Amino acid sequence: MEPIKNLPRLCRTLGYEFKNIDLLTQALTHRSAANKHNERLEFLGDSILSIVISDALYHQFPKATEGDLSRMRATLVRGDTLTLIAKAFKLGDYLFLGPGELKSGGFRRESILADAVEAIIGAIYLDSDLEVCRKLLLHWYAERLAEIQPGVNQKDAKTLLQEYLQGLKKPLPDYQVINIEGDAHDQTFTVECRIDDLSESVIGVASSRRKAEQIAAAQVLELLKK
């Protein structure tokens, strides 16, 4: 996979034009592909995402407790949320992976996709500044920030989908593992989620069956709410 191909199109999708396009290339480069990979950018992006979301929640919910703020932040920055953002950006089409990761479907793996989102955030920060990152992230997260509410528990996607369907008196979703790849210590699970209201199934890919089910459920929820 050629890392530089179609990067202008990705920039348009992200809503940011890089001055130094090499930073974006590095953000999309997995450690299996090159020595100059995205892990340091990922470290930086993780911190920037945390401060931007923390600040947004602090001002959005002036009466929320520290515990509620922490739980909401965890929901917004966790891996399955970042994976959904990556899928919306079609990041898998742009990742630069080594032969082994390509063969095992690394461009679908939730950890690689989530890490790439954080690395892109780090790259944008280095290419601009914190305020530019803040505005962009608030745009990426606008819908999620509008929907999230304080509470004792931030329910996971499977629970939310089940409650949504039950509220409409619809049959519950059916989850099936359709593929398992990789060695026992490094497996990738592909799970299919089917519901009556969608003509086609939705696929989730992750390092565990549970995570793959959560990713599939989250995608179904997004489709149902469109």
UniProtKB/Swiss-Prot annotation:
List, for all copies, the residue spans of the domain called DRBM.
Answer: 156-226
* SUPFAM superfamilies (UniProt xref): dsRNA-binding domain-like (SSF54768), RNase III domain-like (SSF69065)
| A Pfam cross-reference name | Ribonucleas_3_3
Instruction: Please name the catalytic residues of this protein.
Output: 46, 118
Catalytic activity reads:
Endonucleolytic cleavage to 5'-phosphomonoester
Q: Tell me, in one coarse class, where this protein mainly resides.
A: cytoplasm
Q: What is its EC number?
A: 3.1.26.3
Q: Where is the RNase III domain?
A: 7-129
Q: Which GO terms describe its biological process?
A: mRNA processing; regulation of gene expression; rRNA processing; tRNA processing
From the Swiss-Prot or TrEMBL record, state where the protein is found: Cytoplasm
- CC per GO annotation: cytoplasm
Q: Write down the required cofactor(s).
A: Mg(2+)
Write out the GO MF terms: double-stranded RNA binding; metal ion binding; ribonuclease III activity; rRNA binding
Which UniProt keyword terms apply here? Cytoplasm, Endonuclease, Hydrolase, Magnesium, Metal-binding, mRNA processing, Nuclease, RNA-binding, rRNA processing, rRNA-binding, tRNA processing
The keyword Chaperone appears for this protein: no
Question: Which CDD domains does this entry report, sorted A to Z?
Answer: DSRM_RNAse_III_family (cd10845), RIBOc (cd00593)
Does this UniProt record's set of keywords contain Nuclease? Answer: yes
Where Mg(2+) binds, per the record, is at 42, 115, 118
Q: What does this protein do?
A: Digests double-stranded RNA. Involved in the processing of primary rRNA transcript to yield the immediate precursors to the large and small rRNAs (23S and 16S). Processes some mRNAs, and tRNAs when they are encoded in the rRNA operon. Processes pre-crRNA and tracrRNA of type II CRISPR loci if present in the organism.
HAMAP family listed in its UniProt record: RNase_III (MF_00104)
Q: What family is it from?
A: Belongs to the ribonuclease III family.
Cite the record's note on assembly: Homodimer.
The name on file for this protein is Ribonuclease 3
Native source species: Shewanella sp. (strain ANA-3)
What's the encoding gene here? rnc
